[in-house]
Amino acid sequence: MKDLFWHLVGIATGLKILLIPAYHSTDFEVHRNWLAITHSLPLNQWYVDATSEWTLDYPPFFAYFEWLLSQVAKYVDPRMLVVDNLNYESKATVYFQRLSVIVTDLVYVLGVRSCLGSLGLGRDTQQFFAASMLLLLNVGLIFVDHIHFQYNGLLFGILLLSIGSLIRQRFLWSAFAFAVLLNFKHIFLYMAPAFGVYLLRFYCLEQASVVSAVGAVVKLLVVGLTPFAVSFGPFWQQLPQVLSRLFPFKRGLTHAYWAPNFWALYNAADKLAAGVLKVQDGGASTTSGLVQEVRHSVLPAITPPVTFALTALFMLPILVKLFRSAKKQSPLVFLRAVVLCGCSSFVFGWHVHEKAILMVLLPLCLLTLVNREDARYAYVLGIAGYFSLFPLLFDADLYIPRYSLYMSYVAMMYGQLYRIFPGFRGFHTLEWLYMLGFMAIPLYEHLLSFLLHLDQRLPFLPLLLTSVYSALGVLYFFGAYYLYALGISWGKVPIASSTSAAAVKRKRKTK
């Protein structure tokens, strides 16, 4: 098989260009406002200005990134850089911001190629081609970045560069890249325990002497803290204000649309119990659609410390497994630790957005190449996780694109897994039934709700069904995959397989 990587890059880029005129969310105005703030206001006003409700709440490296973009934007349409010009979206502005996402996806492309190379995959193998397809044509990134509008490709590109460096045992480069990533978007802090344990165990503690180990720790601290010094240094006098923007705990337990996690089921159980017991809401409703603090009617109130404690508790087993793993097996355990740390934060985190499922889905694409069990769990989560992003694309004009892109991607994913693992059909009956159950949600949303005249009486029900039903799959994946990762038999499949497409074909023919 030829190296078709750059062909896939071209196909992905063409698709992204076609989506430029598509609907975009309020996040488009968020980033336009950040362009205006960083271009028009002095540095000490960046994290203070509140002209728009969409205040700057990403770490300083992302603010510097917006400033760099603004230096180009001023030649495209300077009116987009006026702070008071709220909700401004000229055609030039739309094209500029859309193209800025596409161009910065180059970092993601480099991250994918680097990471797959670090796994030892030959560029002419079926595994390399399959992983390239799953990552470069990832439907989640297409939904979130190139329709909804964000810059996740840039961020996940840096993450993949860090992972690739770690697997190649370029520990300091990995630590540096991950520290840079944290200063672009602090949500990746939830993956930091996996990186920290790996670097401590397989870099610092692998040194020949105590002196060398101490030296390794010092190097890591210098390399890791330097990006923070460069990032936050100019804001030292305003550090409390910056941190209050980065960690706004008054936003409430869940977002307006419940991310498909444990708290979605918790909220649903509270609503059900309140209905059965005929208890009236004692505060802001969890289904009000507003970003605010809420009170549960029946179940105990949840506070940020509770969510942090649960997140840390559920990260602990895989981190212990990583620390105790043999060096030869450590890259595989590390990748699973990254996935499960990300999933722990998604399942139990405070005010989690549905988009955060990408922190689990994208690293999991790397693990689909390991063996059938990883692939099986990845597919189940993919069905639920990518479907849970549909509420981001609520405009009626997007129904056909969202369903066609989703169905094409999951079909492509199944086809590639079948080629890597001939005879791949390893789903349990309940898994099949669960995945097929997703067809009922659009059937209700687009047909039954109108036939039964429920579209006006219960307009929120499709969102509720999407959130709760997807949450069942996410929690199933989290529990089942966690148990699998902790009890894995390491002798079955190496992390890097040399199986070529020709070998796969021979194997299939001899069955």
From Swiss-Prot:
GO terms for molecular function: dolichyl pyrophosphate Glc1Man9GlcNAc2 alpha-1,3-glucosyltransferase activity. It is found in: Endoplasmic reticulum membrane. GO terms for cellular component: endoplasmic reticulum; endoplasmic reticulum membrane. The chain crosses the membrane at residues 4-24, 94-112, 124-144, 151-171, 210-230, 300-320, 332-352, 356-370, 377-394, 432-452, 469-491. Its main location: endoplasmic reticulum. GO terms for biological process: apical constriction involved in gastrulation; dolichol-linked oligosaccharide biosynthetic process; germ-band extension; protein glycosylation; protein N-linked glycosylation. Its EC number is 2.4.1.265. Adds the second glucose residue to the lipid-linked oligosaccharide precursor for N-linked glycosylation. Transfers glucose from dolichyl phosphate glucose (Dol-P-Glc) onto the lipid-linked oligosaccharide Glc(1)Man(9)GlcNAc(2)-PP-Dol. Functions in developmental processes such as germband extension, the apical constriction of mesoderm precursor cells and ventral furrow formation in early embryogenesis prior to gastrulation. Involved in the glycosylation and intracellular distribution of shg (E-cadherin). This is Probable dolichyl pyrophosphate Glc1Man9GlcNAc2 alpha-1,3-glucosyltransferase. The gene is xit.
